[in-house]
Amino acid sequence: MFEPMELTNDAVIKVIGVGGGGGNAVEHMVRERIEGVEFFAVNTDAQALRKTAVGQTIQIGSGITKGLGAGANPEVGRNAADEDRDALRAALEGADMVFIAAGMGGGTGTGAAPVVAEVAKDLGILTVAVVTKPFNFEGKKRMAFAEQGITELSKHVDSLITIPNDKLLKVLGRGISLLDAFGAANDVLKGAVQGIAELITRPGLMNVDFADVRTVMSEMGYAMMGSGVASGENRAEEAAEMAISSPLLEDIDLSGARGVLVNITAGFDLGLVEVETVGNTIRAFASGNATVVIGTSLDPDMNDELRVTVVATGIGMDKRPEITLVTNKQVQQPVMDRYQQHGMAPLTQEQKPVAKVVNDNAPQTAKEPDYLDIPAFVRKQAD
């Protein structure tokens, strides 16, 4: 007699916020209802964990810090994480992909994030870190700690996306409030996680499976991400151009990227020609040797808007792989039925359609590990 078997082939994605900055970023993601992922907050500060809206929390280093935080000392943060490696391992086990969100420069995020990444890699998990660098006004010492932390973190992750807060300040304008500035940084962190995770977790006309994502992001080093939102007749071309247009990219040769992951998010009116337009726009800057993966996800709240998220990986790496073609899988089940079957609540999208790109001539050297793109939905706030 045959028994019905429940298929459990969905990739397990976990997002770990480390320290105060990482915890705030993950809390922001929880409020924005990013679906299909599990959230954790890791901190030495017991009070911060008690106040967070993140459902699963891990206090590390209680024997060292007594729950009072790392005192802006990365060494204390690292020792705290080392003390509770077993708890971190238990939280990470079973994941196929882990995002680590952290603010570099402080004690816990800077010191503990590399340990979390090391544990994840030891478990064979695809590990991606999305971190911020401090504002210049936070001081040279904090910036030095951040640089050291990023260097250490890069040794233990598959891909590393770095967001320099000071570049955000230049784009958003000096009149922005401190609260809004940090909020913009959280939005970029959310955008990176959301853009990648939705490719796997949300239904679409062209599906990307976990193996495709692993191909683009595994062992790739420094990465950049960008996002653009537009509406109207030319929304596909405009959103794609905005996603790859950034002042940070002026001195960076993106043709050296070894992998490019593209997520097109729109309502049920998304057209095939629009997907083709986005693909052609992205391939115009990508190397012929790069692995380009394009997928779609559907969000009925987008209405007339279309969002393009691009993650380019392996930037600055000398060795390039042979050309790899990735074929997107057509969904056999009707998209609307599959969407409802998953019981997914639509995301709230508050960005307004934008077609204007703000340029910034701030110099960027090829040696700096700031290979990322500031999404257009952040740049629009400068208008």
Curated annotation (Swiss-Prot):
SUPFAM superfamilies recorded for this chain?
A: Tubulin C-terminal domain-like, Tubulin nucleotide-binding domain-like
* Amino-acid positions noted as binding GTP in the UniProt annotation, renumbered to this chain: 20-24, 107-109, 138, 142, 186
GO BP of this protein: division septum assembly; FtsZ-dependent cytokinesis; protein polymerization
GO MF term set: GTP binding; GTPase activity
User: Sorted alphabetically, which keywords does the UniProt record give?
Assistant: Cell cycle, Cell division, Cytoplasm, GTP-binding, Nucleotide-binding, Septation
**Which CDD domains is this protein grouped with?**
FtsZ_type1
Mind telling me which GO cellular component terms the entry cites? cell division site; cytoplasm
Under SMART domains, the record lists: Tubulin (SM00864), Tubulin_C (SM00865)
Q: Where in the cell is it found?
A: Cytoplasm
Q: What is its main location?
A: cytoplasm
The record's listing under InterPro entries reads: Cell_div_FtsZ (IPR000158), Cell_div_FtsZ_CS (IPR020805), FtsZ/CetZ (IPR045061), FtsZ_C (IPR024757), Tub_FtsZ_C (IPR008280), Tubulin/FtsZ-like_C (IPR037103), Tubulin/FtsZ_2-layer-sand-dom (IPR018316), Tubulin/FtsZ_GTPase_sf (IPR036525)
Q: What does this protein do?
A: Essential cell division protein that forms a contractile ring structure (Z ring) at the future cell division site. The regulation of the ring assembly controls the timing and the location of cell division. One of the functions of the FtsZ ring is to recruit other cell division proteins to the septum to produce a new cell wall between the dividing cells. Binds GTP and shows GTPase activity.
Complexes and interactors? Homodimer. Polymerizes to form a dynamic ring structure in a strictly GTP-dependent manner. Interacts directly with several other division proteins.
Q: Which family does it belong to?
A: Belongs to the FtsZ family.
What is this protein's record name?
Cell division protein FtsZ
Which species is the source of this protein?
A: Shigella flexneri
